[in-house]
C-alpha cells in the first residue's frame, strides 16, 4: 500500500484522561475498512473517533468519562470505559445508531457499598484571561455552612487532564472529610498544542 500523511488534528491521538484506577493494555488505535479508529482527548474527556483516507474526522463517542481501550467489529465497537464516576466496565457502541450499552457489571457491588462524591464542574479565568476548568468533590456528609479542610490535587504530565473519571485517592480524601479540588491548568491536554505548550 501507499503511505500517506493524514491531516493534523491538533489533538493527542490517545486518551489522556487521568485515573489511578485503570490498567493498561488493549487497542488504542486500529484500522478497519478504510477507517483509522483512535481515541483522542477533548477538554476533559475521551472521544472515540475515526478518520477516512481523505482525513475526514468523525466523532463516534463523545461523553464524559474515560475510555482506555476498544475493539472494532463490523457494526459495533466494544470498549472499556469509566462512566458516571464508576470503575471501568465493558461497553458496546452501536455504529448504526450511536447507542451505547453497558455489558459488564463487575464493580456494582463496590459502588453499592461505597458512597462516592460526585464532581462539580467549574470554570475560571487565569491572570492572562484564559478560561480554565476544574472540579471539586465535596466531603462525605457535607453540611452547608460547616468548615472543612481542602486538598488541591495536581496532575503531572505534561499533556494529561482531569475529568469525570473515578479516582480512588480523591474519593478516599473526600470520604475522610476533605474538599478535593482539581483543575486542568496550562500544559494540560485536550485543548490543542498551544495550550499544552508551557515553555
Residue ranges, per PLM feature:
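Structural motif
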Residues: 1, 44-49, 85-92
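Multi-bladed beta-propeller domains
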Residues: 1-30, 41, 50-68, 95-119
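Short, structured coil/loop segments at alpha-helix boundaries
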Residues: 5, 49-50, 167, 192
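Short coil/turn segments that connect the beta-strands within blades of beta-propeller domains
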Residues: 33-34, 75
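Residue position within the beta-strands of beta-propeller blades
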Residues: 36-39, 78-80
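Conserved residues at beta->alpha junctions
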Residues: 46, 61, 81
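Serine-hydrolase catalytic core recognition
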Residues: 68-199
Amino acid at each position: 500500500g501507499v503511505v500517506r500523511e493524514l491531516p493534523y488534528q491538533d489533538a493527542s491521538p490517545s486518551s489522556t484522561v487521568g485515573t489511578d484506577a485503570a490498567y493498561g493494555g488493549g487497542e488504542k488505535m486500529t484500522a478497519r475498512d478504510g477507517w483509522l479508529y483512535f481515541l483522542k482527548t477533548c477538554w476533559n474527556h475521551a472521544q472515540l473517533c475515526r478518520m477516512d483516507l481523505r482525513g475526514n474526522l468523525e466523532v463516534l463517542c463523545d461523553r464524559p468519562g474515560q475510555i482506555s481501550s476498544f475493539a472494532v467489529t463490523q457494526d459495533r465497537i466494544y470498549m472499556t470505559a469509566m462512566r458516571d464516576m464508576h470503575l471501568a466496565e465493558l461497553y458496546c457502541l452501536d455504529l448504526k445508531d450511536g447507542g451505547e450499552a453497558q455489558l459488564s457489571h463487575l464493580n456494582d457491588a463496590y459502588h453499592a457499598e461505597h458512597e462516592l462524591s460526585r464532581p462539580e464542574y467549574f470554570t475560571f479565568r487565569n491572570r492572562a484571561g484564559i478560561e480554565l476548568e476544574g472540579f471539586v468533590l465535596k466531603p462525605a456528609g457535607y453540611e452547608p455552612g460547616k468548615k472543612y479542610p481542602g486538598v488541591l490535587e495536581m496532575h503531572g504530565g505534561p499533556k494529561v487532564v482531569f475529568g469525570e473519571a473515578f479516582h480512588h485517592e480523591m474519593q478516599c480524601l473526600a470520604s475522610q472529610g476533605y474538599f478535593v479540588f482539581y483543575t486542568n491548568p496550562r500544559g494540560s491536554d485536550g485543548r490543542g498544542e498551544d495550550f499544552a505548550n508551557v515553555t
